[in-house]
Amino acid sequence: MAAGTLYTYPENWRAFKALIAAQYSGAQVRVLSAPPHFHFGQTNRTPEFLRKFPAGKVPAFEGDDGFCVFESNAIAYYVSNEELRGSTPEAAAQVVQWVSFADSDIVPPASTWVFPTLGIMHHNKQATENAKEEVKRILGLLDAHLKTRTFLVGERVTLADITVVCTLLWLYKQVLEPSFRQAFPNTNRWFLTCINQPQFRAVLGEVKLCEKMAQFDAKKFAESQPKKDTPRKEKGSREEKQKPQAERKEEKKAAAPAPEEEMDECEQALAAEPKAKDPFAHLPKSTFVLDEFKRKYSNEDTLSVALPYFWEHFDKDGWSLWYAEYRFPEELTQTFMSCNLITGMFQRLDKLRKNAFASVILFGTNNSSSISGIWVFRGQELAFPLSPDWQVDYESYTWRKLDPSSEETQTLVREYFAWEGAFQHVGKAFNQGKVFK
């Protein structure tokens, strides 16, 4: 079974393919998508990264065994199992067919139509109208194919479904309003069936379909473009004026800035996104440095070093402790799938890492398990309501605020942070743990 690290930027639909495939196969995929572990545009240009991935592109996957591979379809294939890849030569060929179709037929018109509505590409009316017609053709083709089929290949989800769904994702979220998509009932049924599978939801969260077709906003586009400096012209010296024209041209060429590295459409989208406001900016400064505790926790003994440091420096006025428990233990079946629920939640909370820490544990065995954990948040309230991006999973848990001074809290923090202890409140044996840091 594959295991390793996926380098990407947040909300990269190309990376979703591999993450969903891993949910089905049980591959253990860690995601690095934010500083300090991965800074898109910087980390992927370092010599160390380029030695492993010469193209410098993301997503990129590094296996625990040292195996490296880039290109999203190749990564998704690698972390898949035989069922996803196609269990017969014929099925495998059909899977490759649809994966190729997504790249060659869906990505170009989808980009042409959707990207201007996001303010990251200029609008061309004729090109957009052509793209709409091409999308209609694609949805119609899929609709005819799916008239008597639940999935694209065979009777179960394959990489074909995963890839095509991810490629259509922004169309359904941004521009395929009800009046446009109603002509393709079989395609809609299939899309909804896929995104509501637990393995898809673990990665995508709740997908909200477009209610009103988004339009190009010229003002938004203008604001997203980098502003060029226009320095004041200074009168040149007499000697400068006397320089030969050819010599002055050469100097201008030498002084011209190097063109930026070419980015694909998704990288352009990321670069064009306005910087979000810090949801925690309203809070007073705290003496507790979470990153320093995380370093202690990662690099030194938990019981003898990290925990004493935590309690010595914890700021109970600037931070809060919470106990979380999964609401629906009866729905937990295979332990690897239960563990993937935790991983999926962590992935969707990636932008919260700077202001939170958690140790979440899966207890029990197949068909008899539970999930609970201890969370540390900046401020005195749950952090999730501060951003819509963080609200996908938290309502699936019960949350109880803890008193840092109580003996119960001291015990819970020790057991959950160290992954050892009686865990008397659980009634099941420790299976495995995940840390959000």
From Swiss-Prot:
N6-malonyllysine PTM sites in chain numbering: 434
Keywords assigned by UniProt, alphabetized: Acetylation, Elongation factor, Isopeptide bond, Protein biosynthesis, Ubl conjugation
Cross-linked sites for Glycyl lysine isopeptide (Lys-Gly) (interchain with G-Cter in SUMO2): 285
Location of cross-link Glycyl lysine isopeptide (Lys-Gly) (interchain with G-Cter in SUMO1): 253
N-acetylalanine: residues bearing it: 2
Region annotation (Disordered) ranges: 221-268
Domain EF-1-gamma C-terminal positions: 276-437
Domain GST C-terminal: 88-216
A molecular-function term among this protein's GO annotations: translation elongation factor activity
Cellular component terms per the entry's GO annotation: cytoplasm; nucleus
Alphabetized Pfam families for the sequence: EF1G, GST_C, GST_N
Modification sites for N6-acetyllysine: 147, 212, 401, 434
Basic and acidic residues compositional bias, start-end: 221-254
InterPro entries given in the database record: EF-GSTs (IPR050802), EF1B_G_C (IPR001662), EF1B_G_C_sf (IPR036433), Glutathione-S-Trfase_C-like (IPR010987), Glutathione-S-Trfase_C_sf (IPR036282), Glutathione_S-Trfase (IPR040079), Glutathione_S-Trfase_N (IPR004045), GST_C (IPR004046)
Domain spans labelled GST N-terminal: 2-87
SMART domains: EF1G
Keyword match Protein biosynthesis: yes
Summary of subunit composition and partner proteins: EF-1 is composed of four subunits: alpha, beta, delta, and gamma.
PANTHER family: ELONGATION FACTOR 1-GAMMA
Free-text function comment from the UniProt entry: Probably plays a role in anchoring the complex to other cellular components.
UniProt name for this protein: Elongation factor 1-gamma
UniProt source species: Oryctolagus cuniculus (Rabbit)
Lineage: Eukaryota, Metazoa, Chordata, Craniata, Vertebrata
